[in-house]
């Protein structure tokens, strides 16, 4: 697997290079309890990182969900962990991503219908089959100026990743077919 430093799309100036900032993997369980624990264990096994519990924003009586109840698990991966998981996730979707999966800020989200589609994962009847969402955030150097707490400042539009740049990154650097 390539290092996260090697997966960069260089476009002239060094401050215009595009890289993978983070990958967020989410499993929406829809209920707490044993199902949530199974999903958390699976996510930890797949990514090697400790998942965080995601709570319901509001109560939905028809689904039996109360506000504040944990109903999902997610994990944020950065650097080499993010690249390794992203490569496996792209293999699970046959290196194809829809053009509508890209937003205007350089974020890409796609779903995996069953976790057993990931390479090297076998079916375990005790865990079951889970689908997951994979979200990739692309960035350019200097974006931290806008996100940090102290001495926060605005960043020019050239420092934001556009939809076209994100598509170009996925096609040229990752070898993904965008439909």
Curated annotation (Swiss-Prot):
Gene3D superfamilies: 3.30.1440.10. GO terms for cellular component: cytosolic large ribosomal subunit. InterPro entries: Ribosomal_uL5, Ribosomal_uL5_arc, Ribosomal_uL5_C, Ribosomal_uL5_dom_sf, Ribosomal_uL5_N. The keyword Transcription regulation does not apply. One of its GO terms (biological process) is translation. Pfam families: Ribosomal_L5 (PF00281), Ribosomal_L5_C (PF00673). One of its GO terms (molecular function) is rRNA binding. Keywords: Ribonucleoprotein, Ribosomal protein, RNA-binding, rRNA-binding, tRNA-binding. This is one of the proteins that bind and probably mediate the attachment of the 5S RNA into the large ribosomal subunit, where it forms part of the central protuberance. In the 70S ribosome it contacts protein S13 of the 30S subunit (bridge B1b), connecting the 2 subunits; this bridge is implicated in subunit movement. May contact the P site tRNA; the 5S rRNA and some of its associated proteins might help stabilize positioning of ribosome-bound tRNAs. Part of the 50S ribosomal subunit; contacts the 5S rRNA and probably tRNA. Forms a bridge to the 30S subunit in the 70S ribosome. Belongs to the universal ribosomal protein uL5 family. This is Large ribosomal subunit protein uL5. It comes from Pyrobaculum aerophilum (strain ATCC 51768 / DSM 7523 / JCM 9630 / CIP 104966 / NBRC 100827 / IM2).
């Amino acid at each position: 697997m390539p290092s996260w430093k090697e997966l960069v799309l260089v476009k002239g100036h060094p401050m215009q290079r595009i890289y993978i900032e983070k990958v967020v993997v989410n499993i929406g369980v829809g209920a707490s309890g044993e199902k949530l624990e199974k999903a958390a264990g699976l996510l930890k096994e797949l990514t090697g990182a400790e998942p965080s519990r995601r709570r319901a924003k509001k109560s939905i009586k028809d689904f039996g969900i109360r506000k504040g109840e944990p109903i999902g698990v997610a994990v944020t991966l950065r650097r080499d962990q993010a690249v390794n998981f992203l490569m496996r996730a792209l293999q699970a979707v046959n290196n194809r991503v829809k053009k509508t999966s890209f937003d205007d800020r350089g974020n890409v989200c796609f779903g995996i219908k069953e976790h057993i589609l990931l390479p090297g994962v076998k079916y375990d009847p005790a865990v079951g089959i889970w689908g997951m969402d994979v979200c990739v955030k692309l960035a350019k150097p200097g974006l931290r100026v806008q996100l940090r707490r102290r001495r926060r400042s605005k960043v020019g539009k050239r420092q934001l990743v556009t939809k076209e740049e994100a598509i170009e990154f996925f096609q040229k650097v990752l070898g993904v077919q965008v439909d």
